[in-house]
Amino acid sequence: MSQEKYIMAIDQGTTSSRAIIFNQKGEKVSSSQKEFPQIFPHAGWVEHNANQIWNSVQSVIAGAFIESSIKPSQIEAIGITNQRETTVVWDKKTGVPIYNAIVWQSRQTAPIAEQLKQDGHTKMIHEKTGLVIDAYFSATKIRWILDHVPGAQERAEKGELLFGTIDTWLVWKLTDGAVHVTDYSNAARTMLYNIKDLTWDDEILELLNIPKDMLPEVKSNSEIYGKTAAFHFYGGEVPISGMAGDQQAALFGQLAFDPGMVKNTYGTGSFIIMNTGDEMQLSSNNLLTTIGYGINGKVHYALEGSIFIAGSAIQWLRDGLKMIETSPESEQFALASTSDDEVYVVPAFTGLGAPYWDSNARGSVFGLTRGTSKEDFVKATLQSIAYQVRDVIDTMQVDSGIDIQQLRVDGGAAMNNMLMQFQADILGIDIARAKNLETTALGAAFLAGLAVGYWEDMDALKELNATGQLFKASMNESRKEKLYKGWKRAVKATQVFTQDDDAE
């Protein structure tokens, strides 16, 4: 009797690595998770030890096998999804990184980004990459490493060094250095990739003096890239056949295959991605244009808006203000509120993200009265998440010309029913919460499984992650717009306030 076969997804995140094994129904049968250390050499800098990331991945692969008694020979294929933009540069011969991985959040390369802006390259880089110039993306991180590690530029020019985002690093390690590749979605976040021509951009590479030989080959999101070296996968030589950055993997896991479909992951922040189909649409309102996924010879583009504070606002209520003891408790508090929604919390703790991009804004509260209760404050904080999502969704509709009919949601805060209902009300559209909230890992598994025929085609996937719950808008139009206008006034007032004494 033949053994049952499975797909393994490796989900390499900012604070931990996970391995999840899925069956043919898309159900999770085993998982393992391991955190790894964050490194903060200076204020605003965030780094990881790339070997510690690799060790954590090895550990969770073993953990997933041990928990389930599934053997490596039962894994049909491996899919990888990863924290995007985080940058590793390593020695081609020894495999040893020449510096820590510089993490997507790290601001140490901001002066390089500022110089590019001052030199007038904003328009050119936006038109080619779909991105705004920022330290967030990999390009400035590579330049920083080549500048700060003695001899690195010369070694890179001699072809002795390799660059990769975390997907590339993990495939290189799993194949024992045999394969140096990335995928469309990760390449699109480097600020070096021309997303229209689907090539590394020579003009930007020359501008930053980054040797092309360092860069991985760019592949589709679903094809066999190589096989695991047996000694790195507990005796199994298994195809690695799916790769995508975490937010794009979630888009795929949410089955958002058609233009106009949108997903929002409510994590620490919120990442809203809209499938715009085979047309690259540049935003005129500070959204990012990127590649959603490329499969079967066809690329699907996407618009992305990032909100800095979502789930972390609930953590602030719990840890900072001690208003609640657990995050799920926020729902009960909000439902107990008797306010008429006149309180507005603007959680601009680290500035405002899309579409404002105001790094100087700071958090504020409006509409307090003597009668305002703790419950009212918790409710207003939850509502702030939904208001920010509306800011981005409205902008997406303007940029794309597409009328959005539904928002597909996942992530921790998506479990909050009160928040999801208010989100539906303030948007005036349906909110579809996935039955399986593991959409990021599931997306990587789907991409890997399609490449090896584990699932026949994308239509077969549509049966596997049905909507768990649908929240329908029930608020009348005049109240919806009155509340949202109040939010816009609160944001405007927040941006006027400054802590700078010289601004008088």
From Swiss-Prot:
UniProt keyword rRNA-binding present: no
Keywords assigned: ATP-binding, Glycerol metabolism, Kinase, Nucleotide-binding, Phosphoprotein, Transferase
Post-translational modification: The phosphoenolpyruvate-dependent sugar phosphotransferase system (PTS), including enzyme I, and histidine-containing protein (HPr) are required for the phosphorylation, which leads to the activation of the enzyme.
Catalytic activity of the protein: glycerol + ATP = sn-glycerol 3-phosphate + ADP + H(+)
List of residues binding sn-glycerol 3-phosphate: 14, 84-85, 136, 246
An MF annotation (GO) of this entry: ATP binding
Binding site for ADP: 14, 18, 268, 311, 412, 416
Assembly with partners or alone: Homotetramer and homodimer (in equilibrium).
Protein name: Glycerol kinase
Originating organism: Streptococcus pyogenes serotype M6 (strain ATCC BAA-946 / MGAS10394)
Gene name, Swiss-Prot/TrEMBL: glpK
